[in-house]
Structure formats: structure tokens, C-alpha cells
Amino acid sequence: MTNTDKVQNVCGLKREDFQTRINGKETDLYILRNKDGNEVAITNYGGALVAIMVPDKHGNLANVIQGHDNIQDVVNSPEPYLSTLVGRYGNRIAKGKFQLHGKEYSLPINNGPNSLHGGKKGFNAKVWDALQMNDTTLVLNYVSAYGEEGFSGELKTTVIYTFTDDNELVIDYMAKTNKKTVINLTSHGFFSLAGIANPTPSIENLECEINADFYIPIDEVSIPTGEIRFVKGTPFDFRTPKTIGQDIDADHEQIKNGAGYDHCFVLNKREEGELSFAARIMEPVTGRTMEVYTTEPGVQLYTDNWADGYKGQHGASFPRRSGICFEAQHFPDSPNRPYFPSVVLNPGEQYKQKTIYKFGTIA
């Protein structure tokens, strides 16, 4: 039994609108609810977030995550990664090729000349096995077969969503393989702290802080150049809070290459793998805030630079730059960059990462 069976959901989503069978597996809607009645709604198709209901500074609840209100629209979304889980490899791998243990692997090309977010049918397009443990915890499991989307090894993946009484959405990722492989899991949440609407307001007035002294520059097809650059004196310096819109259209090579921000920031860490502060945004009209904490070495800032005007939950529309993504992850194209933190997973090892999105308000 899920929370959708017990009480009226403040998110307004209906369980039956998410129930169908895809490739022989059942999809459903799961509601996590904390002591204050705030909610997170998730479908097991792609592990997609379809509602995050949190209050503004006046206590008014609104949905701050972009998504869809039925399974057909989730499956057929013009933005296939709209607030979904991403794997096996989040972000880009140059030309869809990499070498591992002396063997070259070829992945589907689905983003210009590159492979993006695990290929043509990544974890965003899979039906996960779901078990709701209690009011606040959902466990998702997926077994990625050997050779799926060109990757080596069978990969057994578990993702646990927890919504705490402190309005923290905690995402724990775990995975094991039976053969050496590469892995880079993340969540592609499109956040709209003003609340989704028709149209959903621009993110350009969000005040943003990112705990990073360095970022990874990209070429014209969004592959890392190989450098790691200091943010000082560039549009990528968010060490002191500034609005997203201040430099999003700056006359800067890197902004042009990303059509805005679509870059990985190298997070400041005292030690590898520590859970630490990554980023914070504040929406000035509603007073809503979101802080990001992660064990990952990087966070991809994406400012919704391409898709424009498609429809979401309850008649909402999502113009270009109405959502913002903080994708906690290892760096893009790491399998081809031995000097980047390793993304190799060996048999007998366990991949683990934790990311927290903490929602709050300021007066």
C-alpha cells in the first residue's frame, strides 16, 4: 500500500494515471510524506520525480519540480530526462567510445557526436522494481543486463529516496557489477522554486551559490577540453551568491558553448567522498531555498537551455530557462580522462553516493 491509498494527496496527482504495463512491468505512483504533510511524488518509470510539495515563506505549498501528471506523458516527454534518474553514465562520453581493460566499448550516439546519459534507453527509460518501506522511504531496484546500451558487466542498482521531516530529499545510490565497468549515476531534477505554473517563471532571478573554485570547460559539442579552470574572473564564479541571470548570456566562449550554463563544477572537498555542501539557490519572491549536499566530486549546473514551452503537471508549461538542475556526479567523459576521478567499478566493490536536496525558506 502506498500513501496514495490513504489520504488525499496535496500534489493532486492520481495513482491510476501512472498505472500501466511497460515491457511486462507495472508502473505506479508513490507518495512520500513527512510529519508536516509536505510531499514528494515519484513514479518507478525512470525513478522520475513528479512532485515536490514544499512551503514558501508564507506557508503556501507549491510543486517545485518539473514533471508530468500521467505515465503516457512521462514516457513520451519532449525532455526525456525530466527529473529522472540517469545511468549507467550520467553526462557525455566523447564519440560514444572508451577503453577499459584493453578493450574498446561503443555506446549509442544520441547527443550530437556523443553518448549522453547512458545511451538511447538509459535508466531514465526503465521500469524500476519499487518497494515503499514507510511513509518517507521508497526503494528502487534495477538490474542492467550485460551489454545493455553497450556497457560491460551486469549492474545491479539500488536507489533509495527518503523525504525527511526537515524537508530534505535524500537520494542514496548503490550498485554492484560482475565485470569491470564504468558508472556515473545522478538525478536530473528540473527545479522551479517559484512553483510550476502556466507559464513557469524564469530561473534567472534565482540567487545561486556554488562551492567550487574550479570548473570544467567544454568544447563546442560539450565535451571537456581536458582543462580544469579557476572560476575567478569568469561567469562561473558563484563562490559569492549572484543571480543566475547575471552572466547567463555573457559574451564568453564557455557560455556560448553551453548556450548558457551546462558545465560541471569541481566541488571544494576536504577529502574524497565526504558529504559536503555543494550549492544553494534562493527564489526571492517566494523565499524558498534549496541546498545541495553530495559525496560526489562534481555537480553539473544546467540552466534548461534548449527545450521550450512543453506542458507539465496540471496544465503547467515549461518555457526555456524555467528549470535549474544540479546533477551531482563524477566528471563528464571520465572514462577517456585518466586524470579525472575514476568511474571504474570492479567486481567485489560497491558503488555508493549520496545527494541531499534540502528545502527551506527565508523571510
Pin down the residues of each PLM region:
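An exposed, glycine/acidic-rich loop-and-rim segment of catalytic or binding clefts
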Residues: 2-363
